[in-house]
UniProtKB/Swiss-Prot annotation:
Function: May be involved in spermatogenesis.
A family per Pfam: POM121
Subunit field text: Associates with the nuclear pore complex (NPC).
Compositional bias of kind Basic and acidic residues: 156-165
Organism: Homo sapiens (Human)
Single GO molecular function: nuclear localization sequence binding
Domain of life: Eukaryota
Classification of source organism: Eukaryota, Metazoa, Chordata, Craniata, Vertebrata
Subcellular location: Nucleus, Nucleoplasm; Nucleus inner membrane
Name used for this protein in its record: Nuclear pore-associated protein 1
């Protein structure tokens, strides 16, 4: 086709481009080959050098006419339209030979050959009649609808070939061999097998599809446009009925004396028009509102809004329209068929999903519908889908309904009218997420006839559904694979009756991204309400489920029950009250189980029923538990943050232990996690009295996820608060978090004490802390109460999974897990951690408790930026009968509670409490401790630093503290802190007295933390106190000179000690005096003006003005080594004081250090 089409750029249509040689190009035409030549006329190539230069400055296309080489049967006109083909020489003589340049005169052989201009970017193609490419079938259009269309093509001729190649003729090879003469050109073309196609092209060409950009190539020529010399007569808008010389001359204009008439008769064209017109009527109409054909495949338009098409052979110039008065130039509107609508997916921002219409599946007496055609059609589907209900070996039969029984306690219902239809099959599990919500309702008492509209009632509100209603997911599939999603009965609600005060569950449908739900009834068996639920059994089931999405009600639920009491059962829809909640929410409700169980429709549920025994707890964990309890079928309150947990645990002293939890208790993410293995609760001991209390979830409360509260204890008394119990071999590790925390570790001897060793392990809480009280295990029971302002919202209650090393080589006859009495428990903000801290027995004063411990624990220091403390206790071979309570707590910014440490006999004595330190207003104390002998540096004191005291209950002579009149302790003011580390090596022998905790000297470092006291002249004062008889007072003076050499001081008169010059160890002898080496480690001490501590009055002073006093951390003689880590803000001088409490004496000495 490249040699048949031309590129035009008429000057009247397009503005000539600037520059020399870019005038209006002359139209392109071709001449016929001479009779003796077997090649086709060369086609202009899209190269500039192949054309003559003067061809670009030719006159406009209106004055160009085609001059064939030999006489043409058609008359030639002077103003013939450009691109008119000659009448002869266009048969099958087509060869795929390379094109020759137009400036080669011997090729053309005719003096009147037209010079071909170079191709341009924009050209106009006049289509005499568009047609469709011969891909599958040609779709011609009647000649009455033909119109010439003038379009502008904007692209190059690259993609033209693929639209013209499909119409290549089969007689092409004959043309290469046999040249045609002028007399046999037209007859030869009609004698070929494509004569019908040629006639159809001349008379009524169809719409042309494809790209309009044609590539001028020697390989693309079409016989359909060549076969007839009279095809040039089809340029006009009105097709002549006969193709004669007059008709052609009318369109060609000036006649040619050498032209001859075409030999084709006029009848053949008219018959072809009638035949093709009938074929068009049988085809689909084009998508056009104007009734006009769309000649374009893609409907692409050019900037001038003119659709474009392709001429099969050539096109006439625009100026030739003046010679054709019947021609109309019309831009066919662009009408493209819209692509098939795609389903818009939800959650992608397009449109919400359609409303899922819950259908009430009325299942009752199915005998009335056995003869129904719908029943027979759906019965086959029911048999195929009932086998896909479970994913295990448990068979879950379809729910059966009782005979029609009219009950008097039915709920007020709303009347609906529905068309009688067949009972619906149970949908497959794959349809759970896509189908509407189906709610089975009990059958009515009336039996309707076939194809009769029945009126029955359904609950007006989803919260007032009967107790036996279970939500069913899935849609109803018909025999063709479709779904019955249409609303059969959609009568509006007529009334809103109140809910009767009966024990009915609350049904909450999913509300997230759901459209308004309309109830519809899709099956008409006889309706009747079910009978009452069976009597609750003694078995308790805990059903756990994973989080579900908003479209599904129930996910696959599995319960892992105990191995000895596990029975795989299913949940009967009559006894299970399932509720639909949000994916991240959990519903804990109660339900009774019976011997007759069946499956929940459209949900795979495995329930493990376990028989409850006193003293044993069965709670199964899962991300989303559904807890069923053996009570009357009713929903408990949904969980809420406003509900407060009230668990109550009683001692296992014969009475059944019960954990009472509020009915609104649901854990959002982490449920109660008991130890999975408690068979090794006591090592090498009898577990006759060890038992786990059952947990009753009717009082359980919820806690936010990722928070936890650790409560563990091994007390004997009923009312003991279960703190963290640390015994030897437990492998406790220090917490590693930004929040300060403590950890206790207790090492028991071979013969352990009868009393439990309780250690409290809690991170610090900036708020108020609880005040637990510890009493004797064999005396009056002391109740553990927590302040009402505390709640364990941060972390759920958890128990260590392994307690095999809870007691080592000891009898566990008196050991048991105490119950938790949370009657006084309260809530706190979720982001806070509860610190359970013991209190002092102080009748009139409050003290800030510090650090207490014994050597030999090998504890490690917490590595957080926030201060923390660590406790360790080592018992001798001959331990005391009294319980040893080690409390380790970091100091917080809020008020710190105090603990009461009572005697072993349970009686609070005047000397049963040991108080150290001056009375002071509670203030935050933060610091870091280290078990090594090397001091730490970098500790920073927060604002409001105060004194530290340490309780000690195991010493023989505790002091009941009564502060001296008029004495007050001072605190450091707010300001920038500085650090300085000191190491004090002390030693104390053991006398073997049962009143002393340490019977023998136990090696190992011990850590104590306390603030240094800045004094005048660059000294640091540190306070140390020790209990003793009323006539005994201890004093320890530690100093350091400018040279840095250690100084010696006298130790308490408990014994005489000989110190090692290295300061790392020392030996002590009782009832003597010894010197203790003191090594001072200071760091970057600087004076900060304007930060003076408050002036205080003191009883006595040493080496100072006696006007200011501040207390540091204590150092009890029982410690083998004391590593002092303190912080100060100024260098001031402070005094010491002595307190007298009745017949007992409490001595406090301030040790001064001289700073460089």
């Amino acid at each position: 086709m490249g040699n048949l089409l031309s590129k035009f750029r008429p000057g009247c249509r397009r503005r000539p481009l600037p520059g020399p040689g870019r005038g209006a190009p002359a139209p392109l035409s071709r001449d016929a080959s001479p009779p003796g030549r077997a090649h086709s006329v060369p086609t202009p190539r899209p190269f500039r050098g192949l054309f003559r230069r003067n061809a670009r400055r030719r006159p406009s296309a209106a004055s160009i006419f085609v001059a064939p080489k030999r006489p043409c049967p058609l008359p030639r006109a002077a103003a013939a339209p450009l691109g008119v083909l000659p009448a002869v020489g266009w048969g099958l003589a087509i060869r795929k030979t390379p094109m020759l340049p137009a400036r080669n005169p011997p090729r053309f052989g005719h003096p009147s050959s037209v010079r071909i201009p170079p191709p341009s970017r924009m050209f106009t193609l006049l289509l005499p009649s568009p047609r469709e490419p011969a891909v599958k079938a040609r779709k011609p259009i009647p000649a009455t609808l033909l119109e010439e269309t003038e379009v502008w093509a904007q692209e190059g001729p690259r993609r033209v070939k693929k639209d013209e190649d499909p119409v290549q003729i089969e007689g092409e090879d004959d043309e290469k061999r046999t040249p045609l003469s002028s007399g046999e050109a037209s007859s030869t073309s009609r004698s070929q097998g494509t004569q019908g196609d040629v006639a159809s092209f001349r008379c009524s060409p169809g719409p042309l599809e494809g790209n309009v950009y044609h590539k001028f190539s020697e390989n693309s020529m079409s016989e359909k446009a060549q076969a007839s010399p009279a095809s040039s007569c089809l340029e006009g808008p009105a097709m002549p009925s006969t193709h004669s010389q007059a008709g052609c001359a009318r369109h060609l204009g000036k006649p040619d004396p050498d032209a001859t008439a075409p030999p084709e008769p006029a009848v053949g064209c008219s018959l072809l028009q009638q035949k093709l017109a009938a074929e068009v009527l049988n085809e689909e109409p084009p998508p056009s509102s104007l009734g006009l054909p769309i000649p374009l495949m893609s409907g692409k338009r050019m900037p001038d809004e003119k659709p474009f098409c392709i001429p099969p052979r050539s096109a006439a110039p625009p100026r030739a329209a003046r010679n054709r008065p019947c021609k109309r130039k019309m831009s066919i509107p662009l009408l493209l068929p819209l692509p098939p609508s795609l389903p818009l997916l939800w959650d992608r921002g397009e449109l919400p999903p359609p409303a899922k219409l819950p259908c009430l599946s009325v299942e009752g007496d199915l005998h009335t519908l056995e003869k129904s055609p719908e029943y027979k059609r759906n019965s086959r589907i029911l048999e195929d889908k009932t086998e896909t209900m479970t994913n295990s070996s448990i068979t879950q039969p379809a729910p059966s309904f009782s005979q029609p029984v009219q009950t008097t306690d039915s709920l007020p219902l709303t009347t609906y009218t529905s068309q009688v239809s067949a009972p619906l099959p149970i949908p497959d599990l794959a349809d759970l997420a896509t189908g509407p919500l189906i709610l089975p309702i009990p059958p009515l008492s009336t039996t309707p006839k076939m194809d009769e509209k029945i009126a029955f009632t359904i609950p007006n509100s989803p919260l007032a559904l009967p107790a036996d209603l279970v939500p069913i997911l899935g849609d109803q599939s018909n025999e063709k694979g479709g779904s019955y999603n249409s609303v059969v009965g959609a009568a509006p609600l007529t009334s809103d009756p109140p809910t009767p005060p009966s024990s009915t569950p609350s049904f909450k449908p999913p509300v997230t991204r759901e459209s308004p739900i309309s109830m519809c009834v899709d099956s008409p068996p006889p309706l009747s309400f079910l009978t009452l639920l069976p009597v609750p059994s003694t078995g308790t089931s805990v059903i756990t489920s994973k989080p579900m999405n908003s479209t599904s009600v129930i996910s696959t639920v599995t319960t892992n029950a105990s191995a000895h009491l596990t029975s795989q059962t299913a949940v009967d829809p009559e006894v299970v009250n399932m509720d639909t909640t949000a994916p991240s929410q959990v519903v804990i409700f109660t339900s009774s189980l019976s011997s007759r169980v069946s499956s929940l429709p459209n949900s795979q549920i495995h329930c493990s029923a376990e028989q409850r025994h006193p003293g044993k707890t069965s709670v199964y964990t899962s991300p989303l538990p559904f807890i069923f309890h053996n009570t009357t079928p009713s929903f408990n309150q949904l969980f809420g943050k406003e509900a407060t947990p009230q668990p109550k645990f009683e001692a296992p002293d014969g009475q059944p232990q019960k954990a009472s939890l509020p009915s609104a208790c649901v854990f959002l993410s982490l449920p109660i996690i008991p130890p999975p293995d408690t068979s090794t609760l006591v090592n090498s001991a009898s577990t006759a009295s060890s038992s786990k209390p059952p947990i009753e979830t009717n009082a359980m409360h919820t806690t936010p996820p990722s928070k936890a509260v650790i409560l563990q204890s091994a007390s004997v008394s009923k009312k003991y608060l279960p703190f963290y119990l640390g015994l030897p071999g437990s492998g406790n590790t220090q917490p590693s978090g930004n929040t300060a925390s403590v950890q206790g570790s207790t090492s028991l001897p071979a013969q352990s004490v009868r009393a439990p060793a309780t250690a409290s392990n809690h991170p610090l809480n900036p708020g108020a802390t609880p005040q637990p009280k510890f009493g004797a295990p064999d005396g009056p029971q002391q109740k553990t109460s927590l302040p009402s302002a505390h709640d364990f919202l941060s972390l759920p209650i958890m128990v260590p999974p392994d307690t095999s090393t809870l007691v080592s080589s000891a009898s566990a006859a008196s050991l048991s897990k105490p119950a938790i009495d949370t009657s006084d428990m309260n809530t706190t903000p979720p982001s806070k951690t509860v610190i359970l801290q013991s209190t002092f027995v102080s009748r009139k004063e409050e003290y800030i408790r510090f650090y207490m411990g014994l050597p030999g624990s090998g504890n490690t220091l917490h590595s957080d930026s926030i201060a923390s403390a660590q406790v360790s206790t080592s018992f001798p071979a001959q331990a005391d009968r009294r319980p040893t309570t080690t409390s380790s707590h970091p100091l917080n910014t809020g008020s710190i509670s105090h603990s009461t440490l009572g005697a072993t006999d349970g009686q609070q004595k005047s000397d049963s409490s040991f108080i150290l330190g001056n009375p002071a207003t509670p203030a935050p104390v933060i610091g870091l401790t280290s078990p090594s002998v090397q001091p730490l540096s970098g500790s920073i004191i927060p604002p409001g630093f105060a004194e530290l005291t340490s309780p000690y209950t195991a010493l023989g002579t505790p002091v009941n503290a009564e502060p001296v009149e008029g004495h007050n302790a001072s605190a450091f003011p707010n300001g920038t802190a500085k650090t300085s580390g000191f190491r004090i090596a002390t030693g104390m022998p053991g006398t073997g007295d049962s009143t002393l905790l340490v019977g023998n000297t136990i090696p190992g470092p011990q850590v104590i933390m306390g603030p240094g006291t800045p004094m005048d002249g660059g000294s640091i004062g540190f306070s140390m106190s020790a209990p003793g008889p009323s006539s005994t007072s201890g004093e320890l003076n530690i100093g350091q000179g400018q040279s840095g050499t250690p100084s010696t001081t006298s130790v308490f008169p408990f014994g005489q000690a000989a110190w090692d010059p290295t300061g790392h160890s020392m030996a002590a002898a009782p009832q003597g005096a010894s010197n203790i080496p003191v090594f001072g480690y200071t760091s970057a001490a600087a004076y900060i003006p304007g930060l003076d501590p408050p002036t205080q009055n003191s009883c006595s002073g040493m080496g100072g003005d006696g006007t200011r006093s501040i207390v540091g951390g204590p150092c009890v003689p029982a410690f083998q080594q004391c590593i002092l880590q303190h912080t100060w803000t100024e260098r001031k001088f402070y005094t010491s004081s002595t307190h007298y409490y009745g017949q007992e004496t409490y001595v406090r000495r301030h040790v001064c250090f001289q700073l460089p």
